[in-house]
Amino acid sequence: DRSVSRGLGDVYKRQPQKLSTIKAALLLPFQEDKRMVEYYEGFLMAVDSLKRTGVSLDLYVYDSGKDISTLNTILAKNEMKSMNIIIGPMHQNQIKPLSDFAEKNDIRLVIPFSQKGEEVFKNPAIYQINTPQSYLYSEVYEHFTRQFPNANVIFIEPSSADKEKAEFISGLKQELKSKGIPMRTVSESATKETLKATLRSDKENIFIPTSGSNVLLIKVLPQLTLLVRENPAEKIHLFGYPEWQTYTRDHLENFFELDVYFYSSFYTNTLFPAAVQFTNAYHKWYSKDLASKYPNYAMLGFDTGFFFLKGLSLYSSELENNLPKMNLTPIQTGFKFQRVNNWGGFINKKVFFIRFTKNFELVKLDFE
């Protein structure tokens, strides 16, 4: 029955029943932010590719504005109660009322942008795509110590401390200490000789700036590059942050020479086959080029739309029990959902490491 929205409450009561038509609603502030339009454009491409494989879908799209009153007007519409899934909102103030509505009506709610919000801890039907930092960090630490079990870590401190990375760095130091991994700290103005004195021949030497800024990179890259050239026998890497994606073009040669790694929960490269295909299709659909910002919102819309709508078409009310089987190759954003507690929803804990190898290869390391 198309009008019955089957949600988490039903999982324990009935056998899964195929949804004859998936009903999905997008609630985003389209007029206010052009990235929301890009997200919608990508989402629409996902809907189209699923329809081509025979999935029956009804998509409802509403401009949610920024006020709770606008949201309430939309939620009062009859059709909203029969949705299988709602994607939105963008604004923080709309999350709680939308979450309450979704929970009351047994509807899955996918929150694509916000990292904050307590609702995911209380509502079992919420999926939070943008991982809260603390969850992301613990995932990065685990991957780091797996990738570099024999590391010698050298932190590079800027002259004025970067508060933004303080939590990440202090957590990483704790993790390294517990694993017995040696570490030391040098300043951004360290000479090549000072840097050389920190190296250990029996270990992988990993330099980690304690700031994600391009300014710090510009300062340390010349000395590190000389260090690598003059010590070819040593294993040396530079490890960094998601925002390095935006500076890659400026430092590409250095990144390859320094065998750079950075972590991110989203990454695409215009040379990856899936990205090439998507970029061409987007151009054909909309007669314009993709925005070059990161993350790319059209790709985010596609990845999110494809994952959840495909999941509902395959598993309907049993989606939550089959999440690990959803093994899709994302264009940009990967998904690895984990329930936050017994009565809460899911957060996305997916993290990639991106590596620029000395052979001029770009590798996306997936840890699952």
Question: Which residues are covered by each model-predicted region?
Answer:
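Single conserved hydrophobic/aromatic residue that forms the stacking wall/gate
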Residues: 1-12
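Short, well-structured alpha-helical segments in soluble
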Residues: 68-84, 194-202
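Extracellular/periplasmic periplasmic-binding protein-like sensory domains
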Residues: 221-298
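Segments of small-molecule ligand-sensing domains
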Residues: 288-295, 306-362
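Periplasmic-binding protein-like
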Residues: 26, 81-91, 109-113, 152-158, ...
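Signal peptide-proximal N-terminal region
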Residues: 38-59, 63
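Glycine- and acidic-residue-enriched helix-capping/strand-helix junction motifs
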Residues: 32-43, 162-166
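Extracytoplasmic ligand/sensor domains, especially the bilobed periplasmic-binding protein
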Residues: 87-89, 93-156, 161-169, 247
